[in-house]
Each structure stands twice: as C-alpha cells, then as structure tokens.
Amino acid sequence: MEKGARQRNNTAKNHPGSDTSPEAEASSGGGGVALKKEIGLVSACGIIVGNIIGSGIFVSPKGVLENAGSVGLALIVWIVTGIITAVGALCYAELGVTIPKSGGDYSYVKDIFGGLAGFLRLWIAVLVIYPTNQAVIALTFSNYVLQPLFPTCFPPESGLRLLAAICLLLLTWVNCSSVRWATRVQDIFTAGKLLALALIIIMGIVQICKGEFFWLEPKNAFENFQEPDIGLVALAFLQGSFAYGGWNFLNYVTEELVDPYKNLPRAIFISIPLVTFVYVFANIAYVTAMSPQELLASNAVAVTFGEKLLGVMAWIMPISVALSTFGGVNGSLFTSSRLFFAGAREGHLPSVLAMIHVKRCTPIPALLFTCLSTLLMLVTSDMYTLINYVGFINYLFYGVTVAGQIVLRWKKPDIPRPIKVSLLFPIIYLLFWAFLLIFSLWSEPVVCGIGLAIMLTGVPVYFLGVYWQHKPKCFNDFIKSLTLVSQKMCVVVYPQEGNSGAEETTDDLEEQHKPIFKPTPVKDPDSEEQP
C-alpha cells in the first residue's frame, strides 16, 4: 500500500489541459488507477437539472412573487434570470474546456487569480456552503416522508434528523460503490421530478383550456398587490437567481465526462433552457388554480395545487417533493466530493482526499469527508443562519469566476479555447451580478459583512496550512502516518491521470502566487527526492 501512496511521484507530469484519456494511460502503463469517464450526455444533463431543481419550485416559489408584486412581473423575473443563468453557464463552458479540470469555479479562480483566491473559494464551500445545503435538502426530504405519519402535528425533530442522516449515509454508500450507480440514481430521480413538474404543467394547460386564466390576462397579471419598489424587484431577481443555483455543478466533474469538449456545452444548451421552461410554466400553472394571495399563504405550493386539482391523487405532490430532494442530495454529494478531491489534489486540503479506490475508482475519502461534514451540520441548530450569511459569498465567487474569463482572454489570448463565446456574454453577466451584489450590500450590510468575515477566516489557515511549506518534521510525520492509516482503511491510492494534473497534491511557492493559468506542468517538490 505504501507503494500506492508513492506512485503519484512516479506519474508523468502533464499539462492540466492535456487531452489524454485516463483509462488509456491506466491500461497502457503499469496498471494504475484513474477517475473513469463514465458521465455521458444524458447523465450530464441529469446532474445539471437535478441540482438546479430541488424542492424550491414545489415548496416555495412564492419568494419571487412576493417581492415582484405582481404575477406578470414575477414571470418576467423567472424568464430573465433563466436567460442570465444561461449566459453565465456559457461563460463557464468556455472556462471548462479551456481549463479542463474538475473542481469548477475553485479550479478556475485558483489558476487565474492564484492560490489564495482559490483557497478562499474552497474554504467557504468546505466550511459552510455544501454541508449546510446538503443538510437542509436532506431535512426537507425527511419532512415530506414523515409528514403523512403525523397529519395533525409536526414530525419530531429527532426523527427528521435521523431519517436525513440515513438518507445521507445511503447515498454516500451508493456514490462510494460506483460512479455508474450514482449517475443512474441521478438520472432516475431527475426524470421523476420532471414527470411531476410535467403533470403540474399539463394540469395548468387543462385549467387554461377551461378558461381559468384570470391572473394571466395582462390587465390582471400586472396588477400590483403592493407598492412598486425597485429594492423589492432586485430582491425578486436575487430570489430567482438562487432558485437556479446548481447550474455550474457539471464543471465540478469535467474530468469524468465522456468527451467533455462536446458534452459540457451540449448539456448546458439542453439543461438551462429546459429548467427555464419548467420554472416559467410551473408558475403559470400555479396561478391558474390559486390567486396570488393563496399562493403566498401556502407553505407548500405544489401540495396545495395538488389538493385543489388532483383530489384523491393529491398524495402525488408530497411524494414528488421527497423524490426531488432525494435526488438533490445525491447530486450535491456527487459534485461536492469532486470539489474537495480537486482541492486536495492542489494541496489545499489533506492529500488523502485526492485518492481514489483501487478497484471502484471513486474518491471514497472525499465522499466520506463530505458526508461527515454534512452529518455534523445536522446536529447543529444554526445552519439556516449560516446559509444566509454565506449565500452572498457564494454568489460573489460566480462573478469573480466570470471576471476571470475576461482576465484570461487578456493575459493568455493564444491558449487553446475549443469554445469561445462573445465577450458580450461575460459583460452582461457581470453587469447583472454587480446590480444584485451592490443591492445585497446596501440592503443587508451586516449579513454580508459576517459572510465576508467567515470567508476571511480562511486567510490565516491558507498561510499556515498551504503557504508555509517547511513545517516541523514531527508534524509531517504525523500527517504521513494518518494518511497511510486512512489509505489502508479506504483501500485508496493516488490516481494516475494524464489529463488533469491530479498527481500533484502541493504547489511550490512560485506557482502559489502566479495570477494566471500557465500551460506548463507544476514541479512536485516531492519528486526531487526521487533518484
């Protein structure tokens, strides 16, 4: 096993953007292991759609309506935010094939702006964003499963958290067992939630055919039920943008895509318009059966919709929400574990997280780390508060990443770009992003300030854990022993990869401060010890 741990130093040093297939290298060399390219176009679409469409469209699409002030303006907000999301996704598509590494915006920010910027993106994701989001989705799943058993009261809190933990453990086992199993689960549950939403849309069309379209007539659709306010409209756009969250998750698994140069942009072209269509027409369907006041008063819009129109079949809606959230947990586990895997590979997280199973070729340590951090969030009571604090930071890094696309065009105009979008796209996205960011700072300065403070706690961690390379020998020996024990327990080794630079787990000092992605291999300091 020690030999497996050392094989990262014997792998060929290749450019991160190399197009060599990992399977080809593994089979042609010495039998090394590597991440497998098992995600086809259908599964890629399932990852995007499954991560965007969670429980929100079923449970609480009222956030946009409440702030927009009218049905018509709310529908416009859903359409515009869908278009802006598509624009941002196209920018990420260019970055994804220019810097074809797993890790998504973390990898892009690190390669373009340097190690500290990338680490801060990773730090906030590891510390709060993914553990809290996954915990909330799992709790939503358990709530909709248990609610029918407690028709006259709320399910017990301990029962909710226990079932959420079981959900997380089950899906972690699936993801550890096989990439193919994980993507099949994602495909099935994404199809299920789309079928449920298709049912809602079809019923809305039936309602329109019956003449139930009072709130869709222009004079009624734009009738304000509150005083128009530009600040509230901005909040509506912010709520809409959050509803499309997850559109960038496919970039986290770029190295496992079959033919990423084709399938990454294709999946984006298919998925984002599909989600926009579903969101807009689901909201149209809702207002054919409910007035804006009824919609705003409902705690679970799809359930209320089902009770009004489905009669004895109303049970379909809560089951649909449960299935949707179950698939959402799976998709988030799958993609976030690849983010942590990529961070460990770059030396920003413990190196054991950059290892994969010798037979299954799944990043088991990263998956277990993701699961454990989420389980810890389940036993805390302040995770919703944490989400509010760091939601602003998460959105901040979307803009930083897209700005990096412009910087990369300027600094490295000649590097290969299989996809090259018009510069108008990142400019449009950044203008929209700046509008929302400035308004967020103005309307909730304390919340945004706390979010920034949480992110900046990563600065001393970076300098102590990453920048400071000459640590005491006793510390290095302890980490090496801990890594070896973890490696034996999980039966994992460092992967041999020819397309991602996965064999490097630390950066040298010079590379840490380079602001722009350089298409030359990074020299692994450990390799200097080899004869």
Swiss-Prot record:
Coiled coil: none annotated. L-tryptophan binds at residues 133, 394. Disruption phenotype: Slc7a8-deficient mice present normal development and growth. Only a slightly altered coordination of movements is observed in Slc7a8-deficient mice. Circulating thyroid hormones, thyrotropin and thyroid hormone-responsive genes remain unchange. Functional compensation by other amino acid transporters might explain the lack of a severe phenotype. The lack of Slc7a8 results in a significant increase of cataracts in old animals, in particularly in old females. One of its GO terms (biological process) is valine transport. Pfam families: AA_permease_2. Keywords: Amino-acid transport, Antiport, Cell membrane, Disulfide bond, Membrane, Phosphoprotein, Transmembrane, Transmembrane helix, Transport. Residues 7-21 have a biased composition (Polar residues). Strongly expressed in kidney and small intestine. Moderately present in placenta, ovary and brain. Expressed in the inner ear. It catalyses: L-histidine(in) + L-phenylalanine(out) = L-histidine(out) + L-phenylalanine(in); L-tryptophan(in) + L-phenylalanine(out) = L-tryptophan(out) + L-phenylalanine(in); L-isoleucine(in) + L-phenylalanine(out) = L-isoleucine(out) + L-phenylalanine(in); L-valine(in) + L-phenylalanine(out) = L-valine(out) + L-phenylalanine(in). Residues 1-29, 499-531 are annotated as: Disordered. L-leucine binds at residues 52, 245. The modification Phosphoserine is found at residues 18, 21, 27-28, 527. Its main location: membrane. The record marks 133, 245 as: Important for substrate specificity. It is a multi-pass membrane protein. This is Large neutral amino acids transporter small subunit 2. The gene is Slc7a8.
